[in-house]
Amino acid sequence: MVSSIKRFLIGRPLKSTELGEQKLNKTKALAILSSDALSSVAYGPEQILIALAGLGAIAYWYSIPIAVGVLVLLTALILSYRQIIFAYPHGGGAYVVSKENLGMNPGLIAGGSLLVDYILTVAVSVSAGTDALTSAFPSLHAHNVIIAIIFVIFITILNLRGVTESASVLAYPVYLFVLALFILIGVGIYNILTGYVSPTLHTPIGTPVAGISLFLLLRAFASGSSALTGVEAISNAIPNFKDPAPNNAAKTLLAMGALLAVLFSGIVFLAYYYGVTPSKEVTVVSQIAEQTFGRNFMYYFIQGTTALILILAANTGYSAFPLLAVNLAKDKFIPRMFTIRGDRLGYSNGIIILGIASIILIVAFQGQTEHLIPLYAVGVFIPFTLSQSGMVLKWLREKPEGWALRLTVNLIGAVISFIVMSMFFLTKFAQVWSILIFLPVIIFLFHRIKKHYDAVGDQLSLKTCERIVPIEGNVIVVPVAGMTHVVENSLNYAKSLSADQVIAVYVAFDREEEKKFEEKWKKWQPEVRLVTLHSHYRSIIQPLTKFIDTVQYKASESNYRVTVVIPQFIPKKGWHNILHNQSSLLIRAYLLYKRNVVITTVPYHLKK
């Protein structure tokens, strides 16, 4: 039944030879890998206006030069990540660049930041989209958390079905959002050019503003730069592209940059010209749409596609998180299970862990994840700064043809990214301080996991000079709970191993019961030695393990190995297990950590 449900949800298993069919073309890749970046157009311009709102509407003209600054940073990031794509065509993005050029710890800081950031991407995006949806249907607002969890589960299942299938479904809402905003910007500019919009709604550029300061402008710039989250996703996901993967990834990155630049600058310009003031109740995009079209079909079309893109921005996390996890797992910094492809050739363990972690965040914050946005943004600019600094060192060290121009691009990007990151810490420390706690903890865990894998590798290697003690005999211990077919089956198996000695062990709680059992045993299995252990505290495990320790100590003197044969019956139906004591599993769990003790479980399958 479980298998049938799994097949229904994620589809039939795919052969490894079908991996090429699971690669993305540029159209689908643009949709699923740029959804996070494009969705930030819905809140990036608004963040600039919110930062300027303290000085009044007269200061809103500063949104134009600030937007130009954001576009300069966007250009530097796009050109930089394009260089990263060709320099590191196997993916890995900021983690690989930082690790190879700055050192292991900077690489782990970049990788750890991005892992957490992709979890935040899913939680924040789905929560924001759910808020947009329940704003249109207020009766659903009380169920925000449940609705958000359902969306996360839906996107998780969609990604478990395979990258091409999820792209085929999710591409439509993304391109509908792009179309909706192009129409909005086009009609808005047309209305301005034809005089339909009054020029008195906004203050002229250059109007003096009392109280303006460089610090406030940098704060607004940092807030607006939140629109650049998700730009790095394509460089992490190069392995998902069809061949030639680096060329296709680079073209997709340029297309995303161009779209983001047009949409972001268009919304900022319309918000300025329309004199839009940010409001808790109505978003900036909603106000622009209402002033442009009124409350008609186009208004609701824009609102609907905006809500969808906010939810589907989570898919960028699902595309990039598993691939980043693969790179970290290959370097032994996180569990190796992240390198295993699932039935549909995706890295399903990474997808599932991302979904679970996102749901935990949504539940913990009760769907009110807007407080995580600054943390989400600073988590992106840390790897931005590190990756571009790494590329600066790479060009200085290698000095290939045209290195000076490449160096300039990366240096500009590194400096601006560092300024933005610093502004987040200076202006929103109360919301981002936690990254200074959990990031070192994550790095510590990375190193502990790496240390464990290295230690295991050293111990398992045949090159290790470890003395092998020869096995000259075998003593078999069979824990028994009664005289049944299960025990009989295990004893027959034990006898077939040609052991030097087979010992049956019975743990009794009652003296009378103990005597009766011994008498019956002599008649049933006279050739098998029985040892009865009396348990004063009704424990099976303690007296049994103590006895096995004694046997093992005696056996080791003669280079004998102790084998414990555990009888276990297997019910016909899985749920029947909850009706029985799982003594065999407990015994096995305890004995696994005993040195020089071999454990064998002998199953006896019930027929009804």
Regions found by a protein language model. Give the residues of each.
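Hydrophobic alpha-helical segments and their helix-loop junctions in multi-pass secondary transporters
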Residues: 176-203, 268-275, 385-400, 448-457
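Loop-to-transmembrane helix boundary motifs in multi-pass membrane proteins
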Residues: 25, 104, 145-149, 242-262, ...
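Extracellular loop-to-transmembrane helix junctions
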Residues: 49-99, 103-111, 124-151, 257-261, ...
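Membrane-interface loop-to-helix entry segments
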Residues: 155-190, 254-255, 373-385, 405-416, ...
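Helix-loop-helix junctions that connect adjacent transmembrane segments
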Residues: 175, 180-229, 427, 431
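C-terminal membrane-solvent junction of multi-pass transporters and transport-like membrane proteins
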Residues: 337-348, 384-429, 459, 463-465
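Extracellular/periplasmic helix-exit of transmembrane alpha-helices
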Residues: 186-196, 251-287
